[in-house]
């Protein structure tokens, strides 16, 4: 049985995450009093496989009840069940903006002092955050990216090694993704855009893929990138980095970067990393621009 506690800052996306967990088969319960968690775990374990994946949403609305959380989880552990904690985070200014847009009242700001309430909540949740298995900062994530993060951690068949790796292909014509930690420019690789049969294809098509990946420049680049990532990823994990965003760019983001990003994704998956792929500009019309 997989038993997950979902918690974090109000406004950081717990409702969305709950929906995404339900989409991948989790039975979700919102704001269960911590004192009831051990009994709930016991009942879930006796459900004869009907409740194999459980997510409990615990937040500041529980007030003083939050103090009961870790004693309850310790009891769960003593009963032979393991658990994971997912903590959702966001910057203060982002949370303020979200609250103002939604016109909701923060649970710790009854008199409307929103920023003060957010800071009080952050302080109250610090201990829980320090014990979290996974921390996702949603400050700059769009909903699709948040779903990718959740799938990367919780989809069956993937092993979480302490870091989520996002690989994104893009076109320099449309700008470099602002959230990338590593950016690789693959415009030095022979360009299939200028070969008539491949001009209107993408790096997803077999002809383009073979052309790009069979180039001697690509083979050498992939080999060196492989070694670089094998070195970097364990060191990022050691330093506590929980997310790595890798951008691979060509001119228009439809040919070379797509084929190479897919190959990088495939190799990382083979090494059992939690990895997601995005082709940001593959659908964009880049007439007259080499890809």
Curated annotation (Swiss-Prot):
Q: Which organism is it from?
A: Ruminiclostridium cellulolyticum (strain ATCC 35319 / DSM 5812 / JCM 6584 / H10)
Give TM segment ranges.
none
Protein's name in the database: Nucleotide-binding protein Ccel_2290
Q: What does this protein do?
A: Displays ATPase and GTPase activities.
Q: Which family does it belong to?
A: Belongs to the RapZ-like family.
Molecular function as annotated in GO: ATP binding; GTP binding
Which domain of life does the protein's organism represent?
Answer: Bacteria
Q: Keywords on this record? A: ATP-binding, GTP-binding, Nucleotide-binding
Keyword Plastid in record: no
InterPro entries, per the entry = P-loop_NTPase, RapZ-like, RapZ-like_N, RapZ_C
- Binding residues annotated for ATP, in chain numbering: 8-15
Q: Which residues bind GTP?
A: 59-62
């Amino acid at each position: 049985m997989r038993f997950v506690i979902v918690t974090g800052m109000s406004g950081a996306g717990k409702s969305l995450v709950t929906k995404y967990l339900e989409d991948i088969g989790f039975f979700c319960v919102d704001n269960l009093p911590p004192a009831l968690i051990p009994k709930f775990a016991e009942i879930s374990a006796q459900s004869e496989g009907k409740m194999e994946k459980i997510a409990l949403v615990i937040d500041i609305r529980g007030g003083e009840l939050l103090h009961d959380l870790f004693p309850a989880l310790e009891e769960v552990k003593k009963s032979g069940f393991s658990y994971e904690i997912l903590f959702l985070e966001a910057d203060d200014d982002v949370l303020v903006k979200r609250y103002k847009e939604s016109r909701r009242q923060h649970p710790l700001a009854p008199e409307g002092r929103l920023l003060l309430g957010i800071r009080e909540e952050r302080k109250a949740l610090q201990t829980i955050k320090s014990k979290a298995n996974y921390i996702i900062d949603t400050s700059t994530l769009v909903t699709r990216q948040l779903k990718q993060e959740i799938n990367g951690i919780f989809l069956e068949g993937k092993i979480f090694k302490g870091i989520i790796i996002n690989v994104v292909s893009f076109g320099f014509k449309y700008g470099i993704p602002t959230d990338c930690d590593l950016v690789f420019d693959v415009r030095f690789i022979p360009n299939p855009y200028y070969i008539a049969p491949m001009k209107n294809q993408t790096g997803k098509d077999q002809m383009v893929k073979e052309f790009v990946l069979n180039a001697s420049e690509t083979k050498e680049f992939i080999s060196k990138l492989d070694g670089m990532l094998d070195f970097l990823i364990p060191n990022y994990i050691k330093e506590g980095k929980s997310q790595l965003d890798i951008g691979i760019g060509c001119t228009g983001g439809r040919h070379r970067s797509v084929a190479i990003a897919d190959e990088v994704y495939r190799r990382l998956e083979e090494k059992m990393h939690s990895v997601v792929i995005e082709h940001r500009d593959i659908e964009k019309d880049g007439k007259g621009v080499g890809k």
